[in-house]
Amino acid sequence: MFISFEGIDGAGKSTIIKKLKRKLPKLYPDKKFVFTREPGGKKLKEAEKIRKILLDKKTNIDPMTETLLYAASRRVHLDSLIWPALKKGHIVISDRYVDSSYVYQGIARGLGVKVVKEINDIATSNFMPDYTFFLSISEEESIIRRHKRGKPDRLEMSSKDFFSRAYEGYFKIINSPTMADRFILVNAEENVGTILKNILNEFDKILKK
């Protein structure tokens, strides 16, 4: 089973996934969980090199090049980590996947979801998550949290308009008839304990199917 986590920057995905990394193996000792993230991937040298290029403040590339680099990194991620883990029967949980490209490059950068999807369909061999948790926060809360973090990377330094387009873009993707079924919406403006509890309840439903 492959599960991705999505959300606008500041939604708290990384924080929640760290907690799931501790909780899930204890709650389901008979299952093997593999946690990873994009761009890059757990101990994947080639994908991590691409990550450094993408997030480096000094990198100056156009949206198409950015999209192709994300797709290349994603292919390495799939081929070297995700697919081998799934073949072993493991449950793979990834912090971001193709939806991030649809939103950030397709909508916020203006390339168009159709173009970005075509590129990623080739790169991923049309491989999609079984479930996607979307951590939802308001645009205003996203701004507050991003400012608190400090030390922004290249993507995080993008304009307010860029993030506004990304925010709206996520809801376009979520409400798309071809994608809506796999999304699980989570109110990420609750306290961390409540968010974690709600997500664990959803995991319990998923893993009992």
From Swiss-Prot:
Protein purpose: Phosphorylation of dTMP to form dTDP in both de novo and salvage pathways of dTTP synthesis.
PANTHER family listed in its UniProt record: THYMIDYLATE KINASE, UMP-CMP KINASE 2, MITOCHONDRIAL
Keywords: ATP-binding, Kinase, Nucleotide biosynthesis, Nucleotide-binding, Transferase
Species: Mycoplasma mobile (strain ATCC 43663 / 163K / NCTC 11711)
An example Gene Ontology biological process: dTTP biosynthetic process
CDD domains xref list: TMPK (cd01672)
Domain of life (superkingdom): Bacteria
Protein name (database record): Thymidylate kinase
Gene: tmk
Protein family according to the UniProt entry: Belongs to the thymidylate kinase family.
Enzyme superclass (EC): transferase
